[in-house]
Amino acid sequence: MLAVNEYFEGQVKSISFDGAEKPASVGVMEVGDYEFGTAAPEVMQVISGALTVMLPGQTEWQTFNAGEQFDVIGNAKFQVKVETQTAYLCIYG
C-alpha cells in the first residue's frame, strides 16, 4: 500500500511502498538543511541531484551525487544539506 508523507513544512515529500525485498520510500527534497532520525538501518540512494551529509559518528560532510548511495545506522540522527531539488530512494531495514 502506498503512503504519502510530508516533512519540514512540505519541503520533503515521499511515498512509502513495499519494496521487492524491504520497505522503501521514494521522495524529493527541496533546497534546505534537514536533520533526520532513523529507527532502523537505511540505505539512501540519490536518484537526481546531490545530498551533502553528516553521518552519525563522522566529523566531515560527504557529498553523494546521482547514482551514489550511503548507509545510515539505525536509531541515529544525521544531517543533510540540499543545494538543488534532489530525488532519492530510501530502503529500510
Swiss-Prot record:
UniProt keyword terms in alphabetical order: Glycosyltransferase, Transferase
A GO-annotated cellular component = cytosol
Is the Protein biosynthesis keyword given for this protein? no
Transmembrane stretches in the record are: none
Q: What is its EC number?
A: 2.4.2.1, 2.4.2.2
The molecular function terms in GO held by this entry are: guanosine phosphorylase activity; purine-nucleoside phosphorylase activity; thymidine phosphorylase activity; uridine phosphorylase activity
Q: What Gene3D superfamilies does this protein map onto?
A: Jelly Rolls (2.60.120.10)
InterPro entries (alphabetical): Ppnp, RmlC-like_jellyroll, RmlC_Cupin_sf
UniProt catalytic activity: a purine D-ribonucleoside + phosphate = a purine nucleobase + alpha-D-ribose 1-phosphate; adenosine + phosphate = alpha-D-ribose 1-phosphate + adenine; cytidine + phosphate = cytosine + alpha-D-ribose 1-phosphate; guanosine + phosphate = alpha-D-ribose 1-phosphate + guanine
Q: What does this protein do?
A: Catalyzes the phosphorolysis of diverse nucleosides, yielding D-ribose 1-phosphate and the respective free bases. Can use uridine, adenosine, guanosine, cytidine, thymidine, inosine and xanthosine as substrates. Also catalyzes the reverse reactions.
Q: Which family does it belong to?
A: Belongs to the nucleoside phosphorylase PpnP family.
Q: What is this protein called?
A: Pyrimidine/purine nucleoside phosphorylase
